[in-house]
């Protein structure tokens, strides 16, 4: 296999840096702030732990590193998460190179970079960023381990276990990699299965060692992350959906919504390349055996003799299991199209190897990637898409703006800052998680003492668990910052209340109250 030249690698590296710069520019132009979850992760990153109420720790550690290097600005919070998507494309390209040569690598990395999931989620700080990177690393290291021998194979299996473990510490859906591994074990040649099985056991042992601190943290804290995950998956059964409005029609609608969403997040680049390949293979029967055989390298020699799996088999193993689990979950509760994000890696790998086998021109790749990048950029920067379609958004209707929930927080909180600053030394209470985390981020210069309060005393999110307002608190005065006025139960403890200020921007409406046990002395 011909090695890529340094000039080729340099060009690809420059294109990757340009893509990262484009993503940062798109987010800046969008005018969006942090999503509530992003602000929550940022707040968690102030206190590194081996786990959190609803998420494992890798993304939070990533934000800690990002802000340590780039500061606490919006792009500073997002920088390393954005970089994960670019690195994922490189890792996928490296795998495609090992399977089918440089042409396959360029197609794989380019296609993945141009998907809508990379172009839009790539602007956000989500657990999908490190998950996708470690999923790609698991794909690469497993391939390398299975095709190596001796000491090199052992090192690759250890690397595979590290990738798997860190993937699970990014997002629990990485456990679906276990089904991918079983798929590949079953599809491997009979004479190789024992070696692959033993190597897989070594990888599992390494992964367990990686997970031990997180498991110990969960055990010490009564398994909050595991319980939260079960609550939003297993315990929300199909009967819960079926008994709701619409019955089983709602179940089917949820499944259809999820399935259609998977087609959408691949974007036009993937579907254009698929169409061109389908038409090319149909029109040229000389290449009809290329896909089933695997692929041919640039020098024309068959690569299948030393390969344990065909590119199609390998790609399906890393796409179908997580797609199936996502569909099951969609039928059980509701459809979230990002549940199966790593499936895009397998799809792009398959198309890249197919494109290399059929010698699809790089010009077609450029056009396809251009279409994907233009569409994702338009969606990211256009605001309310209804306006572009000549539609008017009524006051009671939602806008077609993917950043709608990220707008208005900073403007509202900055307008409240003068009213809040004199009270920075006393506790600030809120009954709304979004308000708590957005206040912590936007007014971080004030270092507010924020506490979660609710009337039932239950634990519904991380801050009601770790930062609850104690029932026996004796503070003579507190600040209430919330979308709604103070609850009567809270007013019974602090009967002297006066509103200090209010603010509204976009969807965000906030009120600030000073609550006291005794009236202010004149």
PLM regions: where:
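Short helix- or helix-capping micro-motifs
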Residues: 16-19, 108-116, 164, 168
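Membrane-interface alpha helices of multi-pass inner-membrane proteins
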Residues: 47, 108, 155-172, 206-208, ...
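Specific aromatic-rich, kink-prone transmembrane helix
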Residues: 89-91, 130-149, 159-164, 347-350
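Membrane-interface transmembrane helices that cradle and orient dolichyl/undecaprenyl
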Residues: 97, 103, 138-156, 186
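Short acidic/glycine- and proline-prone juxtamembrane loop motifs at membrane-interface regions
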Residues: 117-131
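Transmembrane-lumen/periplasm boundary regions of multi-pass, lipid-linked membrane glycan transferases
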Residues: 166, 178-285, 305-330
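Membrane-proximal, lumen/periplasm-facing interface regions of secretory-pathway glyco-
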Residues: 337, 362-423, 434-437, 441-449, ...
């Amino acid at each position: 296999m011909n090695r890529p030249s340094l000039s080729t690698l340099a060009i690809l590296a420059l294109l990757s840096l340009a893509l990262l710069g484009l993503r940062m520019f798109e987010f800046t132009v969008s005018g969006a702030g942090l999503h509530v979850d992003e602000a929550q992760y940022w707040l968690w990153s102030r206190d590194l732990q081996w786990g959190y109420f609803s998420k494992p720790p890798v993304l939070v550690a990533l934000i800690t590193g990002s802000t340590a290097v780039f500061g606490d600005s919006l792009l500073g919070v997002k920088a390393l998460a954005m970089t994960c998507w670019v690195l994922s494309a490189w890792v996928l390209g490296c795998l495609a190179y090992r399977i089918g040569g440089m042409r396959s690598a360029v197609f794989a990395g380019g296609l993945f970079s141009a998907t809508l999931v990379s172009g839009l989620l790539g602007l956000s700080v989500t657990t999908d960023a490190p998950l996708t990177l470690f999923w790609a690393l698991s794909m690469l290291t497993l391939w390398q381990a299975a095709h190596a021998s001796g000491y090199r194979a052992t090192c690759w299996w250890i690397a595979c276990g590290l990738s798997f473990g860190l993937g699970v510490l990014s997002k629990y859906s990485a456990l679906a990699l276990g089904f991918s591994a079983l798929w590949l074990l079953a599809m491997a040649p009979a004479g190789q299965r024992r070696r692959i099985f033993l190597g897989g056991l070594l990888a599992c042992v390494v992964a367990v060692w990686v997970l031990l601190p997180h498991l110990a943290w969960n055990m010490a804290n009564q398994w909050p992350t595991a319980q939260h995950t079960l609550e939003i998956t297993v315990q929300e059964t199909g009967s819960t959906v079926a008994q709701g409005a619409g019955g089983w029609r709602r179940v089917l609608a949820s499944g259809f919504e999820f399935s259609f969403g998977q087609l959408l997040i691949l974007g036009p680049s993937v579907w254009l390349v698929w169409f061109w390949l389908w038409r090319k293979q149909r029109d040229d029967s000389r290449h009809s055996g290329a896909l089933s055989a695997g692929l041919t390298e640039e020098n024309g020699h068959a690569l299948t003799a030393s390969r344990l799996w065909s590119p199609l088999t390998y790609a399906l193993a890393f796409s179908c299991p997580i797609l199936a689990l996502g569909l099951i979950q969609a039928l059980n509760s509701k459809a979230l199209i990002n549940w199966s994000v790593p499936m895009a890696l397998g799809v792009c790998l398959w198309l890249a190897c197919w494109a290399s086998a059929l010698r699809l021109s790089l010009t077609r790749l450029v056009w396809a990637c251009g279409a994907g990048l233009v569409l994702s950029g338009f969606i990211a920067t256009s605001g309310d898409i209804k306006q572009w379609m000549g539609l008017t958004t009524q006051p009671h209707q939602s806008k077609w703006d993917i950043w709608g929930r990220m707008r208005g927080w900073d403007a509202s909180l900055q307008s409240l800052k003068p009213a809040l600053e004199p009270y920075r030394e006393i506790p600030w209470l809120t009954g709304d998680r979004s308000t708590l985390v957005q206040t912590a981020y936007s007014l971080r210069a004030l270092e507010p003492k924020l506490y979660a309060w609710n009337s039932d005393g239950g634990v519904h999110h991380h801050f009601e668990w770790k930062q609850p307002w104690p029932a026996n608190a004796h503070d003579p005065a507190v600040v209430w910052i919330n979308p709604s006025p103070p609850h009567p139960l809270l007013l019974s403890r602090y009967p002297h209340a006066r509103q200090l200020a209010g603010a509204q921007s976009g969807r965000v409406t906030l009120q600030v109250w000073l609550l006291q046990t005794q009236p202010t002395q004149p």
